[in-house]
Amino acid sequence: MTRSLKKNPFVAKHLLRKIEKLNTKAEKEIIITWSRASTIIPTMIGHTIAIHNGREHLPVYIIDLMVGHKLGEFAPTINFRGHAKNDNRSRR
C-alpha cells in the first residue's frame, strides 16, 4: 500500500540537513547514511549517497528517475549466489 498523499514523504532530518548544507555551498561529496527508509526528493538529485546494506556503504548517484523511491531500494542486502549444482555423488 502506498503512503497517503496527505502525509509528506519521510526523509531523515540529519540527511536533509546534510544535503541542504551541500546545496548552499554548491559542493559535491559523498554523504554516508544508514537511513534506508528515507524517500528520495528532488533536492537530492546530483548527489552521491553511500547507503548502508548491513555490511558496508554502497555509493549511489541520485538521478531524476529515482525521485519518489526509497534509498534502500538501491542497496541490496542479500547477495544471491545461485542454487547448488546437482551433485549425484553426494546423494549416494
UniProtKB/Swiss-Prot annotation:
Any one of the GO BP annotations: ribosomal small subunit assembly
SUPFAM superfamilies for the chain: Ribosomal protein S19 (SSF54570)
Keywords assigned: Chloroplast, Plastid, Ribonucleoprotein, Ribosomal protein, RNA-binding, rRNA-binding
Family annotation (InterPro entries): Ribosomal_uS19, Ribosomal_uS19_bac-type, Ribosomal_uS19_CS, Ribosomal_uS19_SF
Keyword Lipid biosynthesis assigned: no
TM spans (from-to): none
Protein localization: Plastid, Chloroplast
GO molecular function, one term: structural constituent of ribosome
GO cellular component: chloroplast; mitochondrial small ribosomal subunit
Gene3D superfamilies, per the entry: 30s Ribosomal Protein S19, Chain A
Primary localization class, coarse: plastid
Function: Protein S19 forms a complex with S13 that binds strongly to the 16S ribosomal RNA.
Family of the protein in this entry: Belongs to the universal ribosomal protein uS19 family.
Name listed for the protein in its UniProt record: Small ribosomal subunit protein uS19c
Organism per entry: Aethionema cordifolium
